[in-house]
Regions:
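ATP/NTP phosphate-donor binding region
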Residues: 1-63, 73, 108-109, 302
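Catalytic core of DAGKc-family lipid kinases
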Residues: 12, 22, 34, 43, ...
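Glycine-rich beta-strand-to-loop/alpha-helix junction loops that act as flexible
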Residues: 15, 66-68, 91-92
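ATP/nucleoside-binding phosphotransfer catalytic cores, i.e., glycine-rich phosphate-binding loops
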Residues: 43, 185-186, 191, 217, ...
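Short conserved active-site loop signatures built around small residues
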Residues: 49, 69, 197
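Short Gly/Thr/Asp-enriched flexible loops that form oxyanion-binding sites at enzyme active sites
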Residues: 71-82
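Glycine-rich phosphate/pyrophosphate-binding beta-alpha loops
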Residues: 141, 145, 198-214, 278
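Gly/Ser/Thr-rich active-site loops/lids in small-molecule metabolic enzymes
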Residues: 156-164, 205-235
């Protein structure tokens, strides 16, 4: 509660979030019962969450985000290096960042983490595509996952959550395709045919259902290139099996490089996503933004 002594909470709500009204009701009850002052700001368009965070950061103790990874991406980018702690009320499809940080998916428990949690500094990635910067907490990528994001209808994501991606993902794997990737990691070039190229800040997907690669940490001052290069749909399924089993000893199909700066270009050009939001088309550059974000996470019991 000491983090809340500098002013009220600012609760930024994406009304398109899954169960937004129900989550807000739970959060209001928890904050009110604790005697904590809070303000609400409901977004109306892309970029609105970042505008709210930038405009009000100096007047509030904590910014709380109700939404998915895309809404969270906007807020942490706007607050980068401000030292302002960010709480999360998960309301997205995957909630990948919240899950990786141990945030409860149940609304009342997540709201209590806002009140009783501890601050945790974390790196961000700063992606530039088409001259525009986009911060991300989880990953930026091109390839099969981007096509899956683009082709899964919004109503399916709202109804089924992460399971809504499953059928689309299977279809993309069976409709197997690759592209030529030209990459640099800290100035060192790499060229490979690939089905997926990801710059990851967090390695765990859906509570370790999949692990993107070895030794990926969000607080080590580095990001991680994860290049997946199966030669067929059958090999692509094998790559997923390896990710589920955390077996990464297949250099002909899996390439991993840690670094601080990356460039990615593709032939043919590929759509780019950052934390679940489509942000442009290759080429793009990424830099690590060390310790840029501060999240409220659950206390660890002794």
């Amino acid at each position: 509660m000491e983090l809340l002594s500098g002013g009220p909470l600012l609760l930024i709500v994406n009304p398109a979030a899954r169960r937004a009204a129900r989550i807000v009701a739970h959060a209001r009850r928890v904050f009110t019962d604790a005697g904590v002052a809070f303000e609400e700001a409901w977004t109306e368009r892309p970029g609105h969450a970042a505008e709210f965070a930038s405009a009000r950061a100096g007047d509030v103790a904590t910014v709380v985000v109700l939404g998915g990874d895309g809404t969270l991406k906007e807020v942490v980018g706007a607050l980068a290096h401000s030292g302002r702690p960010v709480g999360i009320l998960p309301g997205g499809t995957g909630n990948l960042v919240a899950r990786a940080l141990g945030i409860p998916m149940e609304a009342s428990r997540a709201a209590r983490v806002v009140l009783d949690g501890v601050p945790h500094a974390m790196d961000l990635g700063c992606l530039r595509v088409g001259g525009q910067p986009h911060w991300f907490a989880f990953s930026a990528s091109v390839g099969v996952d981007v096509r899956m994001l683009a082709r899964t209808p919004a109503r399916v994501k709202r109804w089924f959550g992460p399971l809504g991606y499953a059928a689309t993902a299977l279809g993309e794997i069976l409709d197997f395709r690759t592209f030529q990737a030209r990459i640099t990691v800290d100035g060192v070039p790499l060229a490979r045919d690939a089905a997926e190229v990801m710059i990851a800040n967090i390695g765990s997907v859906l509570n370790d259902v999949l692990v993107l690669g070895p030794h990926i940490r969000a607080d080590d001052g580095r990001l991680d290139l994860c290049l997946y290069a199966p030669a067929s749909a059958a090999q692509a399924i094998g790559v997923l099996w390896r990710m589920a089993r955390q077996r990464f000893d297949a250099p002909e199909r899996l390439v991993f490089r840690a670094g601080r700066s990356f460039s990615v270009d593709c032939e043919p050009p590929q759509q780019v996503q950052a934390d679940g939001e489509l942000v442009g088309t290759t080429p793009f550059d990424v830099q690590v933004d060390e310790g840029a974000a501060m999240f409220l996470i659950p206390r660890v019991s002794n």
